[in-house]
């Protein structure tokens, strides 16, 4: 699954913001617009036993085309956000089944 950081028109969103993957399927977050974005999983909004810190990318992806890849193996719903733009609504969720 590929998730864009920033919409094609420059909006501060994850695109798609809600999606489903199979357990063990690789997710690629790709900076689409060249604004600094990061991917932080909410420690209170991941399946029990999952270390949110280990699957997050707190360092900024600054340039267009920069990517962060993560593979989630525990089934359930994971919520994530972009730290600098969470207030603007840059949040998302992935369901692993």
Swiss-Prot record:
It is a peripheral membrane protein. Cu cation binds at residues 37, 82, 85, 90. Residues 1-97 form the Plastocyanin-like domain. InterPro entries: BlueCu_1, BlueCu_1_BS, Copper_blue_Plastocyanin, Cupredoxin, Plastocyanin. Its cofactor is Cu(2+). Participates in electron transfer between P700 and the cytochrome b6-f complex in photosystem I. The sequence shown is that of plastocyanin A. There is only 1 difference between the sequence of parsley plastocyanins A and B. This is Plastocyanin A/B. It comes from Petroselinum crispum.
């Amino acid at each position: 699954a590929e998730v864009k950081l920033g919409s094609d028109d420059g909006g501060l969103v994850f695109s798609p913001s809600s999606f489903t993957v199979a357990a063990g399927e690789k997710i690629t977050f790709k900076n689409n617009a060249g604004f600094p974005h990061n991917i932080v999983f909410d420690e209170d909004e991941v399946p029990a036993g999952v270390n949110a810190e280990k699957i997050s990318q707190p360092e900024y992806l600054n340039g267009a085309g920069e990517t962060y890849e993560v593979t989630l193996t525990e089934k359930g719903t994971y919520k994530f956000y972009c730290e600098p733009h969470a207030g603007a609504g840059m949040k998302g969720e992935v369901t692993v089944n």
